[in-house]
């Protein structure tokens, strides 16, 4: 039964729900594509993807396309694509929840034994899909697409990206591969491991690296966007970097403890020197200029440390609210009963389509 329905969330103890197995007709390959204001590029995406998928020797495929609250008619373009292909399954989120949430939504409803995450702007070449599948069948649980060249990015973005990956590796100990984006293939057990991670603040590159498994890599030169421009401003990239570091490392918190000890030691030595110099040589202590400078300096350090504490407290606040990662407004091409079964993978929430008999919920474990 195909479903085109509005979705609502009901709280339920998901730890007591038995996960529903995938339908017998589940495809071997799922491609998850987050979209935000990509109406002009949907047709080009279809033109690039369909020939590649048509030549694959696989037991079926599906395209899970997530419209992350677009305002330009992206979902209408996805619906038009679905009229030409039953493999297309569009999902529209109720608002813009961000790419990390959109990717999680796509993984949540992907049924394939292998799942590929692909950007809608064609900067992730569909031509690499056959090679990814080949490495997966050779035994790799995750196949990463490594950007050998990033000619489409300016020098500033390349420099800051390199700095972020280096800092992330040092502080977090979770060495996220540099020049590797979200474009990758994951085996079903990798996807299931990701879906069992309960945090609401999700830095997907870090989480994908965290779960481990056998990894293979392929190199490629990333082309420019087919249409439009990147929505990743410097401010958004900065916030993503903060999210990545604070999600995987407590080093910034520890650093202020060490820094405080060092400054206290320096202050003690300096105070001892002032006292000894005054007692032994009768040298007067200078005026208030140096004192005012020190006060301002340490006040600045305190403000920075409070800001770092605030970053961690904000993330704790988000986690304790336990809100769903996303809210689905509409979805097409999914079996209603399977959707309800899959909803148990969302910690603390279940998704029910309008009209579904909520008096007969999924079977509970005894």
Region locations from a protein language model:
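Generic recognition of well-ordered alpha-helical segments
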Residues: 44-47, 51, 76, 162-165, ...
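Residues in soluble alpha-helical coiled-coils and helical-bundle/repeat scaffolds
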Residues: 36-40, 123, 127, 195, ...
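Hydrophobic helical membrane-anchoring modules
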Residues: 6-26, 203-366
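Short conserved micro-motifs on helix faces and helix-strand junctions that flank
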Residues: 34, 93-95, 184, 257, ...
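Acceptor/aglycone-binding surface of glycosyltransferases and processive sugar-polymer synthases
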Residues: 89-95, 99-109, 123-207, 223-242
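Conserved amphipathic alpha-helical interaction elements at protein-protein interfaces in regulatory
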Residues: 51, 55, 80, 84, ...
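Structured catalytic core of nucleotide-sugar glycosyltransferases
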Residues: 16-154
């Amino acid at each position: 039964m195909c479903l085109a329905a509005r979705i609502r969330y009901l709280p339920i103890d998901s730890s007591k729900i038995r996960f529903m197995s995938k339908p017998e007709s589940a495809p071997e390959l799922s491609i998850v594509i987050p979209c935000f204001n990509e109406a002009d590029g949907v047709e080009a995406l279809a033109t690039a993807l369909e020939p590649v998928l048509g030549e694959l020797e696989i037991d079926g495929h599906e395209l899970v396309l997530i419209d992350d609250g677009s305002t330009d008619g992206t979902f209408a373009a996805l619906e038009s694509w679905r009229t030409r292909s039953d493999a297309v399954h569009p999902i529209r989120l109720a608002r813009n929840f961000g790419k990390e949430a959109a990717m999680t939504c796509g993984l949540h409803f992907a049924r394939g034994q292998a799942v590929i995450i692909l950007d809608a702007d064609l900067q992730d070449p569909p031509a690499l899909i056959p090679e990814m599948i080949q490495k997966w069948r050779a035994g790799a649980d995750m196949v990463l697409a490594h950007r050998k060249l990033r000619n489409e990015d300016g020098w500033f973005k390349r420099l800051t990206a390199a700095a972020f990956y280096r800092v992330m590796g040092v502080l977090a100990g979770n060495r996220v591969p540099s020049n590797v984006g979200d474009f990758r293939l994951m085996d079903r057990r990798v996807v299931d491991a990701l879906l069992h991670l309960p945090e609401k603040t999700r830095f997907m590159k870090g989480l994908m690296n965290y779960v481990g498994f056998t990894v293979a890599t392929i190199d490629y030169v990333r082309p420019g966007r087919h249409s439009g421009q990147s929505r990743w401003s410097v401010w958004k990239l900065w916030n993503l970097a903060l999210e990545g570091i604070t999600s995987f490392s407590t080093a910034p918190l520890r650093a202020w403890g060490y820094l405080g000890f060092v400054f206290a030691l320096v202050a003690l030595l300096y105070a001892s020197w002032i006292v000894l110099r005054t007692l032994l040589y009768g040298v007067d202590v200078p005026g208030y200029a140096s004192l005012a400078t020190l006060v301002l300096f340490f006040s600045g350090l305190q403000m920075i440390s409070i800001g770092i504490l605030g970053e961690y407290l904000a993330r704790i606040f988000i986690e304790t609210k336990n809100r769903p990662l996303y809210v689905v407004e509409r979805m097409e091409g999914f079996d209603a009963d399977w959707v309800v079964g899959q909803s148990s993978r969302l910690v603390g929430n279940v998704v029910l389509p309008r009209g579904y008999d909520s008096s007969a919920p999924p079977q509970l474990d005894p």
